[in-house]
Amino acid sequence: MADVLVSFKLLPSDSDVDTSVMESEVKEKLNGVCKINNIEEKDIGFGLKYIHLEVIVEDKEGEVDRIEKVLSMVKGVGEINTENVSLI
């Protein structure tokens, strides 16, 4: 089976959320679930930041939903946007 690269935009639930702490918890929660290809903080504007996350998963039904469910359990994550899904 092929692999899929999935990009997510993780928005904090509040402007007071420390995105570096959120990033650490994302790495911890996804350990053993999928391979993290890239994770970085990006600016929205006015001092607000979000986490851009790229993961590699198997190309099978339900994988993106499974990752979203794990990400929703991360403290401080308010919104999860799946930005791109592509075969690699």
From Swiss-Prot:
Entry-linked InterPro entries: eEF-1beta-like_sf, EF1B_bsu/dsu_GNE, Transl_elong_EF1B/ribsomal_bS6, Transl_elong_EF1B_B_arc
Entry-linked Pfam families: EF1_GNE
SMART domains tied to this protein: EF1_GNE
GO molecular function per UniProt: translation elongation factor activity
Keywords: Elongation factor, Protein biosynthesis
Annotated CDD domains: EF1B (cd00292)
Transmembrane spans: none
Family: Belongs to the EF-1-beta/EF-1-delta family.
Job description of the protein: Promotes the exchange of GDP for GTP in EF-1-alpha/GDP, thus allowing the regeneration of EF-1-alpha/GTP that could then be used to form the ternary complex EF-1-alpha/GTP/AAtRNA.
Protein name per the record: Elongation factor 1-beta
Lineage: Archaea, Methanobacteriati, Thermoplasmatota, Thermoplasmata, Thermoplasmatales
